[in-house]
Amino acid sequence: MAMAWLMGLGLALASVLWVELVRDCYHALAHVWSPLYRLHGWHHRVFRSDLSVVSTEIYQKAHWYNDVPEALVMLAFGIWPPLLTWMWQGFSQWPLILAASAGMVYTLGFLLSAIARGVGLPNADEITDLTHRPGPFLTPPAPWMVNRTYHWRHHFDDPNAYFCGTLTLVDKMLGTALSLKGKKIAVTGASGGFGQALLQELHQQGAKAIAITSCGQEVTVIGAEKTIPIRTEQWCIGQEDQLKDLLAEIDVLVINHGVNVHQRRDGQAIQEAYEVNTFSALRLMELFLATVKTNRHIATKEIWVNTSEAEVNPAFSPLYELSKRALGDVVTLKRLDSPCVIRKLILGPFKSKLNPVGIMSAAWVARQVVKGVKRDSRNIIVTINPITFIAFPVKEFFVSLYFRCFTKKS
């Protein structure tokens, strides 16, 4: 009996997931196939940037031209789970067939709510159109479930990304869960191996890359036919306030700078390791988070922090490990109340000035980081060590839980 219940529950959840995948694929297809976009385009005409409605007439038409056809497509494809269950088990297992029909029942809810909004039923939009409600955003874009902040970006950040309606799985698979096109992204430690490689990759993705470096040289990237100089800002540890104007201007801050004192353990080495690897990064984070003020900022501003694989594994440089672990824990703490997305880059040994004997190439690591970002991974692990893929998520979960239980918001 228990097995039958579990099988029924599994079929019901699978059928709901199936129609959600159908909806998101239909949406993505509408942005590349003009006959569908002629219908879907009405949806993009409805809202102002604060999600207020331009016109009640256009709002109602958009549901007849976009939402109702979308729900009908979901309903048509939703017949497959119960049909396949019938072919597999026969009609004698009708409870399983009913369970596999959950996706159709789920879709009927969307169809009826779309019709209600299309005919202008009072309060139908407030009850059923949750991702389009106006008002201030209370949370950053969610990683797995589509919230208002996440969906706002489809309308006003990049309409060729953020296609998902309820679950973000299709965007993660397509690499459209975060658009880098046109984003101003500043990278500290830009003169290092990974910093230069990441700037190159971001430039190729259509981002406006900005180098923040303590070196006096202008940073360049390789274009289609020539070397292109990019905007380079000079900065020294302890002078983070000088970057205030830049931090207010950019969309993404990548905290990538660091120092490795190797086997040293004297007082000066301790101070240098923590000042560069931990405290300067924290000051930059605080300055950047203070610039997150509007709905657009909450939706599009981000911090990426290179905390290193040293968070959970030995790096054979104790002070490097200690300072990076401290940074990692501070980032975990800041995430609890952050007004914008904060990502961790957990990178294994790659060739750089800090690690001349690294195994991976900085260019390859940068490509994997960008792929992870576009899949909206909040913890991007790039390493050759399989232990990290297990140890880091476990550590991050329990440390975050501990901080949540024993700290409180100011």
From Swiss-Prot:
Superkingdom of the source?
A: Bacteria
Active-site positions on this chain: Y320
Catalysis performed (reactions): a 1,2-diacyl-3-O-(beta-D-glucopyranosyl)-sn-glycerol = a 1,2-diacyl-3-O-(beta-D-galactosyl)-sn-glycerol
Q: Which GO terms describe its cellular component?
A: membrane
Record keywords, A-Z: Carbohydrate metabolism, Glycerol metabolism, Isomerase, Lipid metabolism, Membrane, Photosynthesis, Signal, Transmembrane, Transmembrane helix
InterPro entries reported for this sequence:
MGDG_epimerase, NAD(P)-bd_dom_sf, SDR_fam
The keyword Transmembrane helix appears for this protein: yes
Q: How does it sit in the membrane?
A: Multi-pass membrane protein
Q: Where is the signal peptide?
A: 1-14
Where is it mostly found? membrane
Compartments it resides in: Membrane
Q: Where are the transmembrane segments?
A: 71-91, 96-116, 380-400
Protein EC: 5.1.3.34
Any one GO MF term held by the record is:
racemase and epimerase activity, acting on carbohydrates and derivatives
Q: What class of enzyme is it?
A: isomerase
Write out the GO biological process terms.
Answer: glycerol metabolic process; lipid metabolic process; photosynthesis
Q: What happens when the gene is disrupted?
A: The mutant lacks both monogalactosyldiacylglycerol (MGDG) and digalactosyldiacylglycerol (DGDG), and accumulates GlcDG. It possesses intact thylakoid membranes and shows normal maximal photosynthetic activity, albeit with reduced utilization of light energy.
Instruction: Please describe what this protein does.
Output: Involved in the biosynthesis of galactolipids found in the photosynthetic membranes. Catalyzes the isomerization of monoglucosyldiacylglycerol (GlcDG) to yield monogalactosyldiacylglycerol (MGDG).
Instruction: Tell me its family.
Output: Belongs to the short-chain dehydrogenases/reductases (SDR) family.
- This one is known as Monoglucosyldiacylglycerol epimerase
Species in which this protein is naturally found: Synechocystis sp. (strain ATCC 27184 / PCC 6803 / Kazusa)
Coding gene? MgdE
